[in-house]
Amino acid sequence: MACSNLTTMWVSSKPSLSADSSSLSFRSVLKCPTNTSSPPSRASSVSPLQASLRELRDRIDSVKNTQKITEAMKLVAAAKVRRAQEAVVNGRPFSETLVEVLYNINEQLQTDDVDVPLTKVRPVKKVALVVVTGDRGLCGGFNNFIIKKAEARIKELKGLGLEYTVISVGKKGNSYFLRRPYIPVDKYLEAGTLPTAKEAQAVADDVFSLFISEEVDKVELLYTKFVSLVKSEPVIHTLLPLSPKGEICDINGTCVDAAEDEFFRLTTKEGKLTVERETFRTPTADFSPILQFEQDPVQILDALLPLYLNSQILRALQESLASELAARMSAMSSASDNASDLKKSLSMVYNRKRQAKITGEILEIVAGANAQV
């Protein structure tokens, strides 16, 4: 009886300790007789504080593993985006030389009454939209931005009273349009992990047949233009009819020169991944204003225009891939930074709770020792 009173007195004098933990420690030190009961289970022997510490430790380990994955994906995307940009730049000399040849041939044929189907402008009644998306996720809002651009253009065409059809390129766009049967889709295509002339030719054949057969009067290309590693923007370009000067024109007829690129090199500085940028412009060959052709210029033009169409589509696919990889690299970089911040905050909470647990145990030992005196 005296022991229980003594125990109660010590518990009430230590408000910082819980009643359960204090009474257990003092009874064990003073060896007061208590009623024996069945031994507690292993789960019940773990205090809530210990369980909380274990949960925090498991969560910290999970965040560390996630950070390793995002760091690896960031480095892989950084290596791939460099190769994608190199593919765009390496294909530039062929494309620009082809443009110069087409422009010179077209200049010579200005005085002749020549009907070139791919450059013929006719009243627009139906428009084909080639929507280029990515094949994978984990790239921020890359796919959402281009799909929203396509939705806005479809709404605009409906407001103008024009018919439309969609040619979807990319798995993400395919799954999006498959879930919306009210949007007319002519064909579903895949861009591949590394676009080549074969994938571009599949798109070119489809839009070529639609335009030549006059099923559509205009073909617009919606893709994400690669500006830099931290910037890309969804754009709409008129694919058909082709511009006779080899320029890339938007839906309003404004044409821009696309011969300039931002070339970059991935380096490390102070242990971190950095980018060195420089403006790169491919030199184009100078042609004589007077060119002599063995074949009929019209035949040459008919043969080169489909090739030029293929090169434009291939460039759009390559730029879209570079934009996707850059967006993935940026998203994984942000995820790694967020994981690092979360790991620091969780470690701080874990250390505080662990310190509080150790302090409580020390106070219990000191209180028990004082009780024996």
UniProtKB/Swiss-Prot annotation:
Write out the catalytic residues in the record. Answer: C139
| Molecular function GO terms recorded | enzyme regulator activity; proton-transporting ATP synthase activity, rotational mechanism
Keyword list (alphabetical) reads:
ATP synthesis, CF(1), Chloroplast, Disulfide bond, Hydrogen ion transport, Ion transport, Membrane, Phosphoprotein, Plastid, Thylakoid, Transit peptide, Transport
| InterPro entries (alphabetical) | ATP_synth_F1_ATPase_gsu, ATP_synth_F1_gsu, ATP_synth_F1_gsu_CS
| One family name in Pfam for this protein | ATP-synt
Localization in the cell: Plastid, Chloroplast thylakoid membrane
Q: How does it sit in the membrane?
A: Peripheral membrane protein
What switches on expression, per the entry, is described as: By light.
GO term, biological process aspect, one = proton motive force-driven ATP synthesis
- Cystine links in this protein are C249-C255
On subunit structure and binding partners, the annotation says: F-type ATPases have 2 components, CF(1) - the catalytic core - and CF(0) - the membrane proton channel. CF(1) has five subunits: alpha(3), beta(3), gamma(1), delta(1), epsilon(1). CF(0) has four main subunits: a, b, b' and c. Interacts with PAB.
Q: What is this protein called?
A: ATP synthase gamma chain 1, chloroplastic
Species name = Arabidopsis thaliana
